C-alpha cells in the first residue's frame, strides 16, 4: 500500500472519530490528497479496508504456525484489534451502512478479498469449490462476530473472543 493511500486512510479515520461519514464533502476532503480514483465514499471505505489489510499483514509477520482453526482465531482477533484502534471511526462506518445497505453491496468484492487474505494466512486454500465454501464461511463468521465486537466495550475484547471461539468450534464439528 503506498504512502498516499495510507495517509488518506488515516485522514479519513481521523475525520470519522469526530464526524459522520455522511457529512464528508468529497471535493473538499480529497482536495489535498494525491490518490487517484477516489470518486465516492465507497472508494474511501475501500481504501480504509485496504489499510486494515495492510496493518493485518504487518502484524502477522511472525504468526506462529498451528492448526487452521487456531490460526483463523488469531488472525481474526488481530483484525478486530486493529479495528479497535479506530473503534469510533469503524462504528461510524458500520452505522452509515446500516442505514444504507445497498452501499455494502458495492464493497462485497473488497470484503471478500480481505477474507481470502485471512484464509491464506491461516493456510486455507481459497481455490476451488471447497475454497469458495470456506471463504463464505469465514465471511459469515467474521461479520457475525463483528456485531459482537461492535458492542464489546471491554478493551480485551473478551465477548468478541468468546463468540469467535464458539463459531469456530461449531464449524469444526
How would you name each of these model-derived features?
Residues 130-150, 163-170:
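Hydrophobic alpha-helical segments that form the core
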Residues 1-30, 35, 45-46, 50:
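Short, amphipathic alpha-helix enriched in basic
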Residues 57-60, 112-129, 165-169:
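Short amphipathic alpha-helical segments and their helix-coil junctions
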Residues 49-60, 101:
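Short, basic, alpha-helical segments at the C-terminal edge of helix-turn-helix-like DNA-binding modules
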Residues 11-18, 55-59, 93, 141-152:
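Solvent-exposed, amphipathic alpha-helical segments
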Residues 153-161:
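Short conserved catalytic/interaction loops centered on acidic-Pro-aromatic/His motifs
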Residues 61-92, 99:
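Hydrophobic alpha-helical connector segments
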Residues 101-124, 132-143:
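Amphipathic alpha-helical packing segments from all-alpha helical-bundle domains
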